[in-house]
Amino acid sequence: MNKKFTDLAKKSKVIVIKVGSNILVNEKHTLRKKWLATLVDDVQKLQKKGSKVIIVSSGAIALGRDILSKKKLTNLHEKQAAASIGQIQLSQQWQKAFAKLKIQSSQILITAEDLNERRKYLNIRNTIFSLMDLNVVPIINENDTTSTEEIRFGDNDKLSAMITNALSAELLILLSDVDGLYTANPKKSTQAKLITDVTEINHDLEKYIDKDLSEFGSGGMQAKVNAAKLCIQSGSTMIISNGLVNNPLGNIHPKSSTWFLPSKNILTSRQQWIWNRPIQKAILHIDEGAAKALKKNSSLLAIGVKAIEGRFYRGDT
């Protein structure tokens, strides 16, 4: 492992690793078992250095589609059916890979609604902490079978960032089919240059984002940068690195990946939860004075509210 990455990993008590469908599943739509074994080997090395590791794994829909012999899933219900079939195989393969190294793993399926409700959010967080205390590696995925179109995470990049925030993890690693964020799509332009360090996500940076989605995934680079926004506000480092190689964690290098560095202005745990909630039930429009007050962590007074969209209920935040 590269020294800079090794030093960061040593300082990271909790590390979240997101594995996308496009690197977990090959062009024949089957699981890359040999590659998975090398990733699990990397995870064990991180554990031996003292880090707790959480995996956010896509792949259920892609695997289920192959089992159903469907070239294309045309609607949400077909995707949910594929997910319910593929999730069993996905979980089994993770369990087998970790078991070979005598590491216990577990499965957690989460919906956006689970993280939107404070009580459920805290319960999920406490469950994951308990699993980590038992040296169990949680394998997390969105519960695609029960999620609805209107209230889905949409991509596991966002889910992994929210898990990172919930656990106050120091590091999130997004394993992708590209090295990181480029000034242009490297698959389309020979002039594309890799951006290795990002200290601020602004308009100048976002203009480089290619809007294309992956074949199996639903996010693309835009989703990864959105995930980075969530991470850096909570004081976490996020790395986008090429996961197609064997031992993908061992091959992370600062010159061939993109590192999003933590913001100096870190939100509190509750502020992170409010800011990152996947479901917004209603919207408050406030005046300039109220906006300035909130930026200083002052209270919002009724006089500063100009309009309300939707409906708030008791307990909403």
What are these regions (language model features)?
Residues M1-Q104, I108-T317:
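C-terminal catalytic "cap/lid" subdomain
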